[in-house]
Amino acid sequence: MKKVISRIFSLIILIGLITALAYIYNKYYFNDFIKANENKGETSYYRDSSQKYNGLKSYCIENKDYNDALFFKKISVKKDTPYRITCMVKTENVESDKPETSGACISIMGTADQTIPIQGTTDWQKVTLLVDSKEQDTLDISFRLGGYDGYSKGKAWFSDIHVEEGVKDETSDWNVVCFLIDNIDANVEGKQYTYSLTQEDKDLLKDNLKRFANTVESFSNNAMTVSYQTVEIKEPLTSLSYDQENYYYVAAKDVKPLIDDYVQKNEYDHIFIGIRMGDTLSSIPVNEWIGLGSMRYDSIGFSNIRMPNDLRNSTMYKYNIKNDTFPEEVFVHEFLHSLERNLTEKGYTFPALHDNEKFGYENQNKTGLKEWYRDYMRCNIDSNAGKTGLDQIVYKTKPIQLSDFKYAQEIKFENVPHNIIDIVSQIISNFKQVMSSNSNSEINETNYVTITTD
């Protein structure tokens, strides 16, 4: 009798243990993803059966306070190859200290490559990150509540994750657009600012975009060609972004609701935003900038072109044989910041765009830094080591586009275990990946102090 009771008791314990393990597995096991966050104790990770997409349990990140938290997986990739990462994202009460750079997003760890972050409370939406592997043979693909330069709190759910390999467009034909933001109607620091582009503003922006296209083709010795268009946006822009260096400006997230349909349809390689942020009576606070570059709209180069507050008394953007024969300089300068960033990310070493004085190039009255830009684009700057400047490969280093995935190949990414052997195998694999990640310099460049695995 005692043996029977003992066996029954043991069976009950075994069933309870299996039930507990099943609960823990179903709620907290993240397959073969690795979890990482900056501030331990402020983030919870779990599988949420109450929030499903396509019948699949979602992966939930909950930041109770501002944090940068994610789960990621390292995959092997081909060098200099396009990859498309997609997933469905849902958010609840997401707030960010830097909304332009942090929120719910897909990102590549160790880089600034990430999707435009999502804040607030939103229903399921498809998010896509197009990325160039450049010189890397591995990528750490992460799903994030936070960002490379900011922190977020709230909840984010991720589901239906896919990774595809494409075929790169290796032409040097660039498709450039300037969106003319006809109206700003934004509340800044409690004050409502309303400005509109004048017809003269629009004419100057259009003329300088045309001049820009001809100039960069010439400066590159026709190593690149440029097609271009201007698109007027009638709907008012109602939000602006801020940072301590530049004060207020137009970030990708601010303008995305107004231009994204055009961007997706036309596959631009660079985006200019033409805008007026002041007049002779008042101005939105800006820190003297007239152009801002080195930004991205997803993977596309993104620049601001601001019209002078007092255009009547300004020579800016106006061709004049006596005063200014290089009015397109701001367009050229901001575009070159994108090329500079692209080439730097490929691992090349060359002068910074603002290093002109170090190499003996001075700003000229009528032509600005025209000679510097020309020699910069032709890799014709004299240095102690010989000629330097932009390597010609930069003209074929264009943003990844959806058309690069016409013949996409799906990559096995989200490994769902089917039995206990698969589970144990994934746990061992996770442990090895954690040990490898801790010694990986790219990951160490991020500021994660906590890496955990189930």
Regions found by a protein language model. Give the residues of each.
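N-terminal Sec-pathway targeting helices
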Residues: M1-L14
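Hydrophobic alpha-helical membrane-insertion segments, chiefly the h-region
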Residues: I15-Y25
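Propeptide-to-catalytic entry region of secreted or membrane-anchored zinc metalloproteases
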Residues: K168-D269, M277-W289, K318-K322
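Catalytic zinc-binding patch centered on the HExxH motif and its immediate surroundings
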Residues: G278-R306
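Active-site recognition of the HExxH zinc-binding catalytic motif
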Residues: E329-T344
